């Protein structure tokens, strides 16, 4: 995520052919990857060319990052040099996803109490993700394997992790009993992550605030630990002075964080454009990215409020995951647009799932909304996976590298 991104400095380019590394023992995996890929390469030659010119730029440090750097420096030394940076990233993401999915299994409506070990596993899983996410860039520099694929892969994993992290937090505090607050917290988290890359698309520089992702992750880890120790009674207790349930404390923090972060983001978006006449890095309108995340949030809100069967209230986790996958997809496309200095197009297959839900409601839900939600979830997940795999393979092939292995001889592309 963002504070850790300061520790990641990786860049590169791409090709449109399939990677040349499909020999034994990777043939099966490569064939499967080829099957998943989109029929047409997602990136044009012009985008690939501009990607080669991309240079990573960042500024600012969060409050706790300097304190964590010593641990991260020690940790990366423990990692064998043959392990690829992207492999470190994906392992951390999978740990984060698995621990959250277990929590979802026990708390599908975010109102149930899960076994103590599930909250502990989420806390440990998030800490492991944070740590691995922080050292993958260090491993890239250490192994002389920095490429543009690394930066894109890192941000892509972060976009998906954000969905599971915010959902896991809502489950931990049983926020499903307050569906409006749960809806706000989840989509506020996705929106803020999108805005972080939106302002980067405008200014060309990724900015870190004094309170950034490292601090938020540690706060969420504490929430999981409190859930394990205190159980449901903790969240039902009232906060002195404020006189609101303890479970709303993370929600109130989300409100404050959203106002603070968005104020800074939009200040950059409206005044920090580096393109012609204050436009984005691609020369497009600074407001154009709003159409994508705005469409996600508007559709999610309309479907939530118009459902005749209380679809979100009864199945909040499935609902958040469905729209979370769509949000992750459009965020990834925004990152690609920034790195390739290209325009974002509104038409996107990611919206097929939400469109099905919307149309089904428009025609008086002639198909069970719960069934359509599952269909939308599967379609959104498949669309995200196909796009991500296609982009990664196209870049890897163009660079003559492998996504999850370090070649003995490879060029290093410094972008910082």
Swiss-Prot record:
Record keywords: Endoplasmic reticulum, Glycoprotein, Lipid biosynthesis, Lipid metabolism, Magnesium, Manganese, Membrane, Metal-binding, Nucleus, Phospholipid biosynthesis, Phospholipid metabolism, Transferase, Transmembrane, Transmembrane helix
Localization, UniProt: Endoplasmic reticulum membrane; Nucleus membrane
Uppermost EC category: transferase
Pathway participation: Phospholipid metabolism; phosphatidylethanolamine biosynthesis; phosphatidylethanolamine from ethanolamine: step 3/3; Phospholipid metabolism; phosphatidylcholine biosynthesis; phosphatidylcholine from phosphocholine: step 2/2
Ranges for region Disordered: 1-22
Pfam families the record matches: CDP-OH_P_transf (PF01066)
Positions of Mg(2+) 1 binding: 133, 154
Site for Increases basicity of active site His, residues: 151
GO-annotated biological processes: phosphatidylethanolamine biosynthetic process
Primary localization class, coarse: endoplasmic reticulum
GO cellular component: endoplasmic reticulum membrane; Golgi apparatus; nuclear membrane
Binding site for Mg(2+) 2: 133, 154, 158
UniProt key word Transcription regulation: no
Glycosylation sites: 144
Active site as annotated: 155
Catalyzed reactions: CDP-ethanolamine + a 1,2-diacyl-sn-glycerol = a 1,2-diacyl-sn-glycero-3-phosphoethanolamine + CMP + H(+); CDP-choline + a 1,2-diacyl-sn-glycerol = a 1,2-diacyl-sn-glycero-3-phosphocholine + CMP + H(+); 1-O-alkyl-2-acyl-sn-glycerol + CDP-choline = a 1-O-alkyl-2-acyl-sn-glycero-3-phosphocholine + CMP + H(+); a 1-O-(1Z-alkenyl)-2-acyl-sn-glycerol + CDP-choline = a 1-O-(1Z-alkenyl)-2-acyl-sn-glycero-3-phosphocholine + CMP + H(+)
Record note on quaternary structure: Homodimer.
PANTHER family xref list: CHOLINE_ETHANOLAMINEPHOSPHOTRANSFERASE 1 (PTHR10414:SF27), ETHANOLAMINEPHOSPHOTRANSFERASE (PTHR10414)
The name this protein goes by in its record: Choline/ethanolaminephosphotransferase 1
Protein species of origin: Xenopus laevis
Species classification: Eukaryota, Metazoa, Chordata, Craniata, Vertebrata
Protein encoded by which gene: cept1
């Amino acid at each position: 995520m963002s504070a850790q991104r300061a520790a990641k400095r990786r860049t590169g380019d791409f090709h449109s052919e399939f990677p040349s590394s499909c020999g034994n023992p990777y043939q099966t995996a490569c064939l499967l990857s080829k099957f998943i890929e989109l029929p047409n390469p997602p990136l044009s030659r012009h985008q690939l060319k501009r990607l080669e010119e991309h240079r990573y730029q960042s500024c600012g440090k969060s409050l706790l990052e300097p304190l964590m750097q010593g641990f991260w420096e020690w940790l990366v030394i423990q990692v064998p040099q043959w392990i690829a940076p992207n492999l470190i990233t994906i392992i951390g993401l999978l740990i984060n996803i698995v621990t959250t999915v277990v929590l979802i299994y026990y708390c599908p409506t975010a109102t149930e109490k899960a076994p103590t070990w599930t909250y502990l596993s989420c806390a440990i899983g998030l800490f492991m993700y944070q740590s691995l996410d922080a050292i993958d860039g260090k491993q890239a520099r250490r192994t002389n394997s920095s490429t543009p694929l690394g930066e894109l892969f890192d941000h892509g994993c972060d976009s998906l992790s954000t969905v599971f992290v915010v959902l896991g937090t809502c489950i931990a505090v049983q926020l499903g009993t307050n569906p409006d607050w749960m809806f706000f917290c989840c989509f506020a988290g996705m929106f803020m992550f999108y805005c972080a890359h939106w302002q980067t698309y405008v200014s060309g520089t990724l900015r870190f605030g004094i309170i950034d992702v490292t601090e938020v992750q540690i706060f969420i880890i504490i929430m999981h630990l409190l859930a394990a120790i205190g159980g449901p009674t903790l969240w039902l207790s009232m906060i002195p002075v404020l006189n609101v349930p303890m479970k709303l404390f993370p929600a109130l923090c989300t409100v404050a964080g959203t106002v603070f972060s968005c104020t800074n983001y939009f200040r950059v978006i409206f005044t920090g454009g580096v393109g012609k006449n204050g436009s984005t890095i691609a020369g497009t309108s600074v407001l154009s990215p709003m159409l994508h995340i705005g469409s996600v949030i508007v559709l999610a809100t309309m479907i939530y409020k118009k459902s005749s069967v209380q679809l979100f209230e009864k199945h909040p986790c499935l609902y958040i995951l469905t729209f979370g996958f769509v949000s992750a997809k459009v965020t990834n496309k925004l990152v690609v647009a920034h790195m390739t200095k290209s325009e974002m197009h509104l038409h996107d297959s990611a919206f097929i799932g939400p469109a099905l839900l919307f149309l089904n409601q428009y025609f008086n839900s002639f198909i069970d909304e719960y069934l359509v939600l599952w269909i939308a979830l599967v379609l959104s997940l498949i669309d995200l996976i196909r796009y991500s795999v296609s982009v990664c393979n196209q870049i890897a092939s163009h660079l003559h590298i492998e996504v999850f292995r370090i070649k003995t001889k490879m060029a290093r592309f410094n972008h910082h």
